[in-house]
A protein has these predicted regions:
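Eukaryotic intrinsically disordered, low-complexity regulatory linkers and tails enriched in Ser/Thr/Pro
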Residues: 38, 67, 71, 77-98
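Conserved binding/recognition cores within well-folded domains
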Residues: 1-68, 72-75
């Protein structure tokens, strides 16, 4: 069992889900939409039809991509505004806790 806190991002590849975690990568059969429904939307965001990222690990947001742990992930046009606003809100919340 994988802790959601350890998931950096999830990608779908050839009908498989690849969970990229702080402890390594795990591949299982499944649908990205089903996984997204189960994750906490305060922390997890869909960047495009193939990737879900954990905001805890995002280090940079650009117009058309996000960077987390050195990995560049494309952001589709339809998700750009949501990702920028949700990331800003996430960072504001994080700053309040400090």
């Amino acid at each position: 069992s994988i802790s959601t806190n350890d998931i950096t991002y999830v990608e779908v590849f050839d009908h498989n889900l690849v969970y990229h975690t702080t402890g390594g990568d795990y591949t299982v059969r499944g649908r990205l939409g089903d996984v997204y429904e189960q994750l906490d939307h305060d922390y997890f965001l869909a960047c495009n039809r193939s990737f879900i990222v954990n905001l805890r690990y995002v280090t940079e947001i650009c117009t058309d991509h996000v960077i987390l742990n050195g990995t560049k992930i494309s952001v589709s046009k339809s998700h750009r505004k949501e990702i920028q606003s949700r990331f800003s809100a996430f960072m504001d919340k994080r700053a309040e806790k400090v």
